[in-house]
């Protein structure tokens, strides 16, 4: 029997890279998608050597307007059947909304929201025909509340949580597993790239990428629509649902600021 195939976006580093190792250990063939071809090729060789799985790499920037369609066309042309889609690619930016570059904020929306939605819509019908596989979307605990000074990023992750929950409900009984992994602060390059490394949020305790990836995979396998990584993050996610919104905004604003 041929192994199932998992496509992982944003696979070259961070949570995506760790998820690639998790799926490879479970015997999945992989399609790894990210911008940096050399890094992908190095990772593919490592996964093939360590886990004996087939790995295909596709260097593409999903922040580009037509990237999802081009990726889908390449998959069809190559005859690759995707059983599990892991939408992990994304980025954030810290700063006042009116001061951050408009083009980069629109790219963030496209990558975090539009590309994720497009790939899910393009790949889902064939999964439904086979009645197996599923989708694992990587969201964030940022999606549970508004985020002053990371306003667009928090909003995109709110979309991911809402979209995934609705999709999981629609596909109940289909044989597909649909989950949203919601990590909190994690030890990746995300904070540095977002300009948030010195914020109070990322000065607090962070989880390791391997732990987050393991929790995400196990939660998806268990059929949980929402997988909050870590007990502390789970309690935070619960708390913001019952605390006054004005208080939550003040706390998040403080966490997203840099210490004096």
Please describe what each predicted stretch is.
Residues 12-13:
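Conserved glycine-rich cofactor-binding loop
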Residues 26-43:
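Conserved glycine-rich Rossmann-like NAD(P)H-binding loop of the short-chain dehydrogenase/reductase
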Residues 96-98, 104-109:
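Substrate-binding pocket helix/loop in short-chain dehydrogenase/reductase
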Residues 140:
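Residue(s) in the substrate-gating loop at a strand-loop-helix junction
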Residues 168-235, 246:
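SDR active-site lid
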Residues 120, 156:
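Active-site helix of classical SDR
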Residues 88-93:
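Conserved NAD(P)H cofactor-binding loop of Rossmann-fold oxidoreductase domains
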């Amino acid at each position: 029997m041929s192994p199932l195939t998992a496509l992982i976006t944003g696979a070259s580093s961070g949570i995506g890279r760790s998820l690639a190792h998790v799926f490879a250990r479970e015997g999945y063939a992989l399609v790894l998608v990210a911008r940096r071809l050399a890094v992908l090729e190095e990772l593919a060789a490592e996964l093939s050597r360590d886990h004996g799985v087939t790995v295909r790499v596709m260097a593409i920037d999903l922040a580009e307007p037509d990237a999802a369609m081009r990726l889908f066309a390449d998959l069809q042309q190559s005859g690759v059947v995707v059983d599990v889609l892991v939408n992990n690619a994304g980025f954030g930016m810290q700063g006042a909304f009116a001061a951050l570059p408009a083009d980069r904020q629109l790219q963030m929306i496209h990558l975090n929201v539009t590309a994720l939605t497009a790939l899910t819509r393009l790949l889902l019908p064939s999964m439904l025909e086979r009645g197996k596989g599923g989708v694992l979307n990587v969201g964030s605990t940022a999606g549970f509340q508004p985020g002053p000074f990371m306003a667009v990023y928090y909003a995109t992750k709110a979309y991911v949580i809402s979209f995934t929950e609705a999709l999981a409900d629609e596909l109940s009984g289909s044989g597909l597993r649909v989950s949203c992994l919601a990590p909190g602060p994690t030890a990746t390059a995300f904070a540095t790239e977002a300009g948030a490394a010195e914020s109070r949020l990322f000065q607090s305790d962070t989880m390791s990428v391997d732990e987050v990836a393991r929790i995400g995979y196990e939660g998806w396998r268990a059929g949980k629509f929402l997988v909050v990584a870590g007990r502390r993050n789970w309690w935070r996610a619960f708390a913001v649902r019952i605390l006054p919104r004005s208080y939550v905004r003040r706390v998040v604003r403080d966490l997203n600021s840099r210490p004096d």
